[in-house]
């Protein structure tokens, strides 16, 4: 079977789970459960919602101190349980009881570890506003999370990885950034969820429906810029303290937005590629083959086939050789040679279009125009982005433009989503702390 992998897919969290009580039943989830909760001892946790590609609505528990990020499952309307790993329900390690105030909305959580003392955390005041962002002729549907209290507040725009992702595709990050005192803007990607338009990103490949003159990532950058302008025009927001965070493709895009918008306050690249897109695809071919356990002889075959189809796409030569090699792979039951892109090309014209308008894109030249502080985080064990190469390339490109406020870190045992491998029970150590400390110095936020 051909392995299908969306390039730079979202956060890469292991969303598949065993059968569970349906959290979408009436009364099981209400929006008042989502938010930031603070204990009297300074312990801060978040409850976020996530909607999977299949439309399932899931709930995440995040402990910003320990790094635990796991799915929780309903026992009753206001009692939920968390198991020992991301998707496991049993044996239960934590029981979460939502406490309601006089109006019936959630005002806090009671946390009952199976082995440990109980604690209570009060829900932090937070304004949640549905918004519409104009981007050219399109309309992006989103949500603005505003801190309570007098502004103007520093703010952050969250940018998606590739794929049909919505404002609920950011895992623990919306409320994590909110817990730091930032206003947070999240939105449905163009052509996804409630946003209008057609989605074009690194995962869509060569599309005949692309508008004339389209080049990747034009529309993504247009939407990121529109989100920035939207925040800049809000009276609650400090226009001099608006920055970007993105994961995967969104991490790359955060740096491009900072290059375009000279008044951006900061940019955070989480696992984003830094180099030509074709180079990242070629890296993925070998890394994913090894991750699937293929022997090195087969990894070599994968890389040779990857080099072949990319050469054909770049030069237009030897298309017949590519078709013959692909047909042979299918005939010989070697579908492991193919990925979703090389397996789906139907013509040389399509391959050439993909190269000229998407695969040849290189984010590095624009980085010489970035003047704001930049943070880059990559996972040591990421099979989708070459972490050492990306970190080095980003540092060098920014330095060439004279940017001296550049921080890069490769997270030990981190995955593409920066979850800790091998079991993905939590964010890898250092992720939340690094973001928090770095932003305190650059975004003017106080201690929670």
Model-predicted segments: where are they?
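N-terminal cap/lid segment of alpha/beta-hydrolase-fold proteins
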Residues: 112-150
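Short beta-strand element of the alpha/beta-hydrolase
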Residues: 152-161
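The serine-hydrolase catalytic nucleophile loop
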Residues: 163-175, 189
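Conserved alpha/beta-hydrolase
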Residues: 178-198
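Accessory cap/linker subdomain of secreted extracellular hydrolases
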Residues: 201, 268-369
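Alpha/beta-hydrolase active-site loop
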Residues: 206-235
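Primarily recognizes the serine-hydrolase "nucleophile elbow" in alpha/beta-hydrolase
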Residues: 226-291
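Short beta-strand/loop motif that positions the catalytic acidic residue
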Residues: 370, 376-378
């Amino acid at each position: 079977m051909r392995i299908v992998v969306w390039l730079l897919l979202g956060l890469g969290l292991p969303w598949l789970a065993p059968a569970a009580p349906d959290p979408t039943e009436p009364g099981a989830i209400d929006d008042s459960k989502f938010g930031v909760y603070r204990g009297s001892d300074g312990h801060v946790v978040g409850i976020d919602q996530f909607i999977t590609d299949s439309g399932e609505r899931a709930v995440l528990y995040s402990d910003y101190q320990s790094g635990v990020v796991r799915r929780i499952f309903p026992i009753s309307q206001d009692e939920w349980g968390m198991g020992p790993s991301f998707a496991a329900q049993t044996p239960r390690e934590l029981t979460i009881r939502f406490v309601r105030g006089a109006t019936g909305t959630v005002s806090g959580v009671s946390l009952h570890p199976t082995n440990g003392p109980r604690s209570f955390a009060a829900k932090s005041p937070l304004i949640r506003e549905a918004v519409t962002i104009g981007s050219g002729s399109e309309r992006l549907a989103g949500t603005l999370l505003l801190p309570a209290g007098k502004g103007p507040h520093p703010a952050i725009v969250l940018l998606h990885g590739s794929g049909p992702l919505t404002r609920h595709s950011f895992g623990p990050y919306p409320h994590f950034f909110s817990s730091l005192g930032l206003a947070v803007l999240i939105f449905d990607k163009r052509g996804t969820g409630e946003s209008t338009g057609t989605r074009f990103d690194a995962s869509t490949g060569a599309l005949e429906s692309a508008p004339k003159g389209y080049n990747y990532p034009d529309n993504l950058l247009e939407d990121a810029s529109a989100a920035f302008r939207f925040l800049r025009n809000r009276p609650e927001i400090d226009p001099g303290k608006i920055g970007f965070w993105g994961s995967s493709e969104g991490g790359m895009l955060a740096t491009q937005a900072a290059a375009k918008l000279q008044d951006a306050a900061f940019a955070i690249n989480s696992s984003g590629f830094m180099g030509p897109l074709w180079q990242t695809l070629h890296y993925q071919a070998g890394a994913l083959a090894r991750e699937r356990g293929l022997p090195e002889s087969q990894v070599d075959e994968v890389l040779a086939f990857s080099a072949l189809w990319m050469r054909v796409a770049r030069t237009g030569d030897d298309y017949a050789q590519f078709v013959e090699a692909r047909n042979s792979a299918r005939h010989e039951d070697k579908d492991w040679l193919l990925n979703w892109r090389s397996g789906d090309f139907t013509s040389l014209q399509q391959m050439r279009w993909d190269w000229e308008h998407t695969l040849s894109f290189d984010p590095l030249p624009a980085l010489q125009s970035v003047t704001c502080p930049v943070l880059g985080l990559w996972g040591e064990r990421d099979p989708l982005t070459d972490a050492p190469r990306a970190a080095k390339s980003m540092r060098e490109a920014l330095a060439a433009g004279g940017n001296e406020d550049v921080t890069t870190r490769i997270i030990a045992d981190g995955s593409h989503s920066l979850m800790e491998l091998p079991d993905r029970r939590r964010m890898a150590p250092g992720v939340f702390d690094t973001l928090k400390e770095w932003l305190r110095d650059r975004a003017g936020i106080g201690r929670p």
